[in-house]
UniProtKB/Swiss-Prot annotation:
This is Protein BEX3. Residues 40-59 have a biased composition (Basic residues). Residues 87-112 are annotated as: Interaction with p75NTR/NGFR. Self-associates. Binds to the DEATH domain of p75NTR/NGFR. Interacts with 14-3-3 epsilon (YWHAE). Interacts with DIABLO/SMAC. Ubiquitinated. Degraded by the proteasome. Residues 1-62 are annotated as: Disordered. The lineage of its organism: Eukaryota, Metazoa, Chordata, Craniata, Vertebrata. It comes from Rattus norvegicus (Rat). May be a signaling adapter molecule involved in NGFR/p75NTR-mediated apoptosis induced by NGF. Plays a role in zinc-triggered neuronal death. In absence of reductive stress, acts as a pseudosubstrate for the CRL2(FEM1B) complex: associates with FEM1B via zinc, thereby preventing association between FEM1B and its substrates. Residues 87-130 are annotated as: Interaction with 14-3-3 epsilon. Belongs to the BEX family.
Length: 130
């Protein structure tokens, strides 16, 4: 009987380590190997507890973001509307991007034209290059 019990214990051990260590961080639910029988007995209890704890942890992690976002929105509404500000901002960004793109294109053309005009004497060589 003892051997069979030990084999089961060894088979379950990796699962317990994988599932329970992550949410709790090696503290609760990760008992020393000396308490093998207790550990096995408490496995379901610990696992359920940790599962709920993990979910609660995720919710708590998300909450500050919501709390942070809501007051800002209220402030912006008071100042003249959240949506308008965002739309203005997006339009400005789009215009800036458009200007940047135009500048880049102009620079590229200028460089190309500059190269062509610089190499005007070697125009045939320039064209022959693959």
């Amino acid at each position: 009987m003892a051997n069979i019990h030990q084999e089961n214990e060894e088979m379950e051990q990796p699962l317990q380590n994988g599932q329970e260590d992550r949410p709790v961080g090696g503290g609760e639910g990760h008992q020393p190997a000396a308490n093998n029988n207790n550990h096995n007995h408490n496995h379901n209890h610990n696992h359920n507890h940790n599962h709920n704890h993990h979910r609660r942890g995720q919710a708590r992690r998300l909450a500050p973001n919501f709390r942070w976002a809501i007051p800002n929105r209220q402030m912006n509404d008071g100042l003249g509307g959240d949506g308008d500000d965002m739309e203005m901002f997006m339009e400005e960004m789009r215009e800036i991007r458009r200007k940047l793109r135009e500048l880049q294109l102009r620079n590229c053309l200028r460089i190309l034209m500059g190269e062509l005009s610089n190499h005007h004497d070697h125009h045939d060589e320039f064209c022959l290059m693959p």
